[in-house]
From Swiss-Prot:
The gene coding this protein: rpsO
Keyword field contains rRNA-binding: yes
Protein name: Small ribosomal subunit protein uS15
HAMAP family named among the record's database cross-references: Ribosomal_uS15_B
Organism annotation: Brevibacillus brevis (strain 47 / JCM 6285 / NBRC 100599)
GO biological process terms on file: translation
């Protein structure tokens, strides 16, 4: 299922760093994580959907790059995002 506008707004409000923030790494990582989780559920039922699998791998790579950037820029913000999203178990 695609990410609804309400859920996206909710994620932005939860992870933003200031009032008008929609593009900070934290927000982007949260939205990508939500999309990745949704696509994982889709791929569990549609195992042969290789086009979607390629999109999933692209999103995972993009999230990894954003996490690397955030870790190098500010370790505290990185740890906060990882803990809040439940990544890196």
């Amino acid at each position: 299922m695609a990410l609804t506008q309400e859920r996206k707004t909710q994620l932005i409000q939860e992870f933003r760093t200031h009032e008008n923030d929609t593009g900070s790494p934290e927000v982007q990582i949260a939205i990508l994580t939500e999309n990745i989780n949704n696509l994982n559920g889709h791929l569990r039922t549609h195992k042969k959907d290789h086009h979607s699998r390629r999109g999933l791998l692209k999103m995972v790579g993009q999230r990894r790059n954003l996490l690397t950037y955030l870790r190098e820029a500010d370790v505290q913000r990185y740890r906060s995002v990882v803990d809040r999203l439940g990544l890196r178990r």
